[in-house]
């Protein structure tokens, strides 16, 4: 079945809301944090059964082992042994981000194009690009992208779109927005010919231009998408992103879930959940964990700092995750990082992911109490 979305409580203080998304593979309480499992695995974490919704990257799975191979094995849920909801992207984000470089402060599309681009050609039909593994020439069109996501069998899928860097000129920016909506319509048509149990979110582009964001909202509202996803360039920093998210959500109807693509650090969640965002995806918690940044109820902990060398206190006294329940001290975890013990990143990742789930649980509670 396609997803069902219910608003359980609308805050009296803001546009924030508590909701529930029902899929064939389970229920997602919203607002929700969605960790990114790039290759079908959360880095540093083996057990993902307590993660309500997990984000997998079509591009990487298309390159290896191949989406047709995964389909032959029964789909992504069976392949990675997960009996809970999965969302996949179109593959476009990875293709364009590999070409245009890294992102800053989790705000997408701010960077300069690399000298050696993985993109060979962008046409109205799709994009030709080189595999990051072996340089093999590949083609991704709306239909190819959706078929790949059909092969994977994710519960929520995303239409193909073009991700532009922040510094694109106005003429190309406008033509890219137009091409993206043509691609999304083709993606939706292909999906609706064979919907299966899957749902598709329409992606809203428009950069930081309020009028273009309004046009993007009108496009997704006019088509039978099952949910909305805010994508494209969101500015160069948090201060630029907040008004973009505010004005975008103000143009959306309230009957469908809203996802903020690629944004999931704590400051961004806290700044935008009040606008009615229902889910956030990011690799931030596991990436931070691998670099020794521990998220805690007492604030972020840079565990490698000398201050923790003899600190036998628990990592987070209020946390009940496996790491904290194992009574690991801050001094011991610091030691593991200092000697480059692989377990360090594992313990930290387990904790950070649990912390994010607790943060979202608390946010839902605050919304129910009309505190957000």
Swiss-Prot record:
Primary enzyme class: transferase
InterPro entries: TGT, TGT-like_sf, tRNA_ribo_trans-like
Keywords linked to the UniProt accession: Glycosyltransferase, Metal-binding, Queuosine biosynthesis, Transferase, tRNA processing, Zinc
Active-site residues per Swiss-Prot or TrEMBL entry: 89, 281
Residues that, per the record, bind Zn(2+): 319, 321, 324, 351
Chain positions recorded as substrate binding sites: 89-93, 161, 232
Function in brief: Catalyzes the base-exchange of a guanine (G) residue with the queuine precursor 7-aminomethyl-7-deazaguanine (PreQ1) at position 34 (anticodon wobble position) in tRNAs with GU(N) anticodons (tRNA-Asp, -Asn, -His and -Tyr). Catalysis occurs through a double-displacement mechanism. The nucleophile active site attacks the C1' of nucleotide 34 to detach the guanine base from the RNA, forming a covalent enzyme-RNA intermediate. The proton acceptor active site deprotonates the incoming PreQ1, allowing a nucleophilic attack on the C1' of the ribose to form the product.
Name of the molecule in the record: Queuine tRNA-ribosyltransferase
Organism of origin: Chlamydia felis (strain Fe/C-56) (Chlamydophila felis)
This protein's encoding gene: tgt
